[in-house]
Swiss-Prot record:
It is found in: Cell inner membrane. Member of the two-component regulatory system PfeR/PfeS. May activate PfeR by phosphorylation. Gene3D superfamilies: 1.10.287.130, HAMP domain in histidine kinase, Histidine kinase-like ATPase, C-terminal domain, Two-component histidine kinase, sensor domain. It comes from Pseudomonas aeruginosa (strain ATCC 15692 / DSM 22644 / CIP 104116 / JCM 14847 / LMG 12228 / 1C / PRS 101 / PAO1). This is Sensor protein PfeS. It is an enzyme of class 2 (transferase). PANTHER family: SENSOR HISTIDINE KINASE CUSS (PTHR45436:SF15), SENSOR HISTIDINE KINASE YKOH (PTHR45436). The gene is pfeS. Residues 241-446 form the Histidine kinase domain. Coiled coil: none annotated.
Length: 446
């Protein structure tokens, strides 16, 4: 079941954008709008000074002073004014009417936002006496000239138009960088492959390392490019090697054809040369198939001892060796999870190679032990061994050491390694004491 990480990334990005836009409009935008409804510091000081003057008049002259100041301020600002006590009673000589008392039901302080009330009525501001706030306050209907202007069309455009547009543009940029830029790189890479530019610069590591569909696509594209490079290299190597390797048997066939050998000897010579060419072609096709197709081979539990015994019988028949020279120290508990035919082919190549390089009275043995979920098998011969710097070279196709020129085509070990690796195992070599030791690392059967 696919998790669709790219879908979740895009969904999360869009949800985050919607939440940010909602916060912008309903929190930041409203906060900016509310900030335009507060009195300016100078206006606050101006009204607070009226409260100080009202307190002074009331304390000096009592109700008469409060009434006089109320009338003067009302006439000066052309607005409604009242001086009230702690219980909202009038401090002047004129009591408040019912309508005037209704103005006191919702009064605003100087640091509150100011806006028109219902029916376009100016707000009423309550300003406590600065000296003794518990004894009274000045209540004044805010003069028209002091009413804050509120949200201007330009501010509204910035908070509800320009900034959201910039956020939308930022979202588009993020989507472009997250989607379009990688797609452009993938397109350029595909165009390079279409133009046979197989050695062009591979995709950047961050793109191939992405844990989403685009990262998987980049990995698949690079895998395809690598397969194409390997296929092309193998084709070139195949053509170059076949053209070189076939020259020798063809030349020998030409010599045999032109010679005056007896018919029976000529037939044997032709059979040997044709067999060599057939073996070369079969091995080359096997190696090319494993390298290019990389098949998923079905596996089964296999008893390693049984495979060795079958190979030993064939090897003894072909080489004339005594079976005692091919001992196996594995028990019936050595069961590996492999493809039987591929393992048999690989071990046959290894055994033939070991016999070919063994001395006349030498032995080739097979032993091993289980290490965790794998079996570590060792095929040991008593031949001359291989130089340390050549231990990896012997597994390369068509590679023959100087002292083995003319023996085989250099494909046996390469085919064996490919066959083992296709089954999840490993094959490597080390020098024994004496001879060469070939190590097989195979999955253990459950």
């Amino acid at each position: 079941m696919r998790r669709h990480p790219l879908l979740w990334k895009l969904a999360l990005l869009q949800v985050g954008f919607c939440l940010l836009l909602t916060w912008l409009i309903y929190t930041w935008g409203l906060s900016v709008e509310r900030s335009t409804y507060f009195l300016a510091p100078a206006d606050r000081h101006y009204l607070a000074d009226y409260a100080r003057q009202a307190e002074d008049a009331w304390r000096r002259e009592g109700a008469a002073g409060a009434e006089r100041f109320r009338k003067e301020l009302s006439a000066k600002e052309d607005t409604w004014v009242a001086l009230v006590g702690p219980h909202l009673e009038s401090l002047g000589s004129t009591p408040l009417s019912a309508e005037e008392s209704s103005h006191l039901t919702f009064m605003r302080k100087l640091d509150w936002p100011m806006s028109r009330r219902l029916q376009d009525e100016l707000p009423y501001v309550s300003i406590e006496f600065p000296g003794h706030p518990e004894q009274g306050r000045l209540v004044i209907q805010l003069p028209e000239r002091l009413l804050p202007g509120g949200l201007t069309p330009w501010t509204h455009l910035v908070t509800h138009g320009i900034v959201p547009t910039l956020l939308a543009a930022l979202l588009g940029l993020l989507l472009y960088r997250h989607l379009v830029v990688p797609l452009n790189r993938l397109r350029d890479r595909a165009d390079a492959l279409r133009a046979d530019e197989l050695e062009s610069t591979p995709l950047a590591a961050p793109l191939a390392a992405r844990r989403d569909e685009l990262g998987e696509l980049a990995q698949a594209l690079e895998h395809m490019a690598e397969r194409l490079r390997l296929s092309l290299a193998q084709q070139r190597l195949l053509l170059r090697t076949l053209s070189h390797e076939l020259r020798t048997p063809l030349a020998r066939l030409r010599i045999a054809h032109d010679s005056e050998l007896p018919p029976e000897q000529l037939r044997q010579r032709l059979d040997r040369e044709i067999g060599d060419m057939q073996r070369l072609l079969e091995d080359t096709l096997d190696l090319a198939w494993m390298d290019t197709e990389r098949p998923q081979l079905p596996t089964e539990p296999v008893l390693a001892l049984s495979v060795w015994e079958a190979l030993r019988d064939d090897a003894c028949f072909e080489s004339g060796w005594d079976p005692a020279r091919l001992p196996c120290r594995l028990g019936v508990d050595c069961r590996v999870e492999v493809h039987l035919d591929s393992l048999a082919q690989a071990m046959e190549n290894l055994l033939r190679n070991a016999i070919r390089h063994s001395p006349e009275d030498g032995t080739v043995s097979l032993d091993g032990e289980r290490e965790g979920d794998f079996w570590h098998l060792r095929l040991q011969d008593q031949g001359p061994g291989v130089a340390e710097d050549q231990l990896e070279r012997i597994f390369l196709p068509y590679q023959r050491l100087d002292d083995s020129a003319g023996e085989g085509f250099g494909l046996g070990l390469a085919i064996a390694r490919r066959a083992i690796e296709l089954q999840g195992g490993r094959l490597w070599a080390s020098n024994g004491k004496p001879g060469l030791c070939l190590h097989l690392w195979l999955p253990a059967a459950a």
